[in-house]
Amino acid sequence: MKKICLLALSALCLTASAQDPYLNNTIINTSDVFGTSRFVGMGGAMGALGADLSVISSNPAGLGMISKNEMSLTAGASWLGNNSAKGMAAGTFGQFNQIGAVASFKGSGKLRNINLSFNYQKKADYNNSFFGETYTAASWADQLYGLAGEAYDNRGLLYGRPETYYNTLYNLAETSGLFDDVIVKDPSDPNSTLSVSRGSLNAYEFNLSMNLENRYFIGMTVGVDNVDIRRGTDYWEQRTDEFGQIQDFGYVNEQIITGNGFNLKFGAIVRPFESSPFRLGFTVETPTWYNLKYIDDQSLTTKYYWDDKAGKAFYDPAPGQYYTHYVYDLSDSYINYLEYRITTPWKVRAQMGSTVSTNFAWGLEYEYANYPGASTRYPSSYGGTTVDQDFKEITNMMFKPQHTLRAGMEFKPVSALAVRAGYNYITSTTTPDSYWDPYFSDNALAYPTGLDYMNLSDTHIATFGLGYRYKWFYADLAYKYRYQKGEYYAFDSFYSNVEKSPIPVDLSRHSITATLGVRF
């Protein structure tokens, strides 16, 4: 088996991140609570209660309940739990989480006030890392060879271009028979993965809201998202050959995704009973339309040894010698650079909340997001964009609708002091038996990236907060614990016919935030 086969597959991997469900799910799935410390302390369940800058995202109508000018600033820190079977604790301190302002203008007649607002806040934190080992007979290199054979069977020659057969980088073997599974690996030899990701998803939001008769509130928010994800994966496996020599195979993948998105949110809140503070809220959030840019750099390092059917060695390194090949460096704008677009699903939220006297408030919220409705598009050479139907099929197969339940409360033992608590339950967007097969259809053959994927559990978020008010000034603190598990697969073992062996990953995260604000 030629070593070049691995290089050709690695070259293919560079051509599109848009086919990578691991990163795409990271972008479109923002199942967390960020914002002011009051909002976080109540678990984000303030869509019907309103009167906080962070409801600009959950229910735009809630800002209509603010009758004075307001400004707030939030900063914080977060740290990871025991982040895998072997654990890699890490923290991010000095985070800037939120800043916003409301300008309130008095109305006349039934229009009590009209407000213009701006708010910046974090939507997702991508700072994460984990390391793990599995002991299995499955081989990443073996899987890659199986994919190479699949590519040849379906494509004939790479991209259907005969000249690629003579290109050193794309030198696929002449017949698919040369891609038979050949890697025999002892389960006692480890497979190791180190994954490190950095970055965040941030939102800049502009809001118009109105208060009608102190019973009806309406609002609209225009949101602009900024995406910055940097992820590095280092995979290493080894086997002991029949002569007792250790043969290594290493794969390093560096990925960068940047870009912007746009969305709209429409909200309404009503007090159905004039004499009661009880409120009902409803929000519709359009998809976020992302324009993204992707850069990928991959390398393969191996001492594996293969023969062809005739027994002739295609590649035979000297003892102790490694062969490393970087497919293309980052300066190449054709192979390692891609522009694409993602459309996230529609979201709807139903909310309720109320106050009891002047010292207690509660809120409940339900959100539905149809993640199978997400889609990917590419710029077309004829102008406009083209929907990737193959990836849409993958999305329908892998993802399922997400349901989110939020609950929160605030208690004031005295008028100046508040104690808050909240809870979120968020269902997973993937099924436990989901897997990633980058060669499931002809179109997708030209767009694989890495072979790794992660199946996620449901998410639980518990929050606690404290607040202090004095005249025009307020200060709030919040603590958040986000609990989620994952099963990470460096590859699917379909072509190896070996039982899967995932790395258990603990995605738990702790965070604290502090907010300072003024109303005048």
Residue locations for each model-derived region?
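Positively charged n-region of N-terminal signal peptides that target proteins for export
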Residues: M1-I4
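Glycine/Thr-rich phosphate-binding loops that ligate phosphate moieties of nucleotide
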Residues: L7
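Hydrophobic h-region of N-terminal signal peptides that target proteins for export
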Residues: S10-S17
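Outer-membrane beta-barrel porins/channels
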Residues: Q19-F34, V40, V102-F520
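Outer-membrane beta-barrel translocator/receptor signature
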Residues: S37, L49-S58, L63-A137, G199-N202
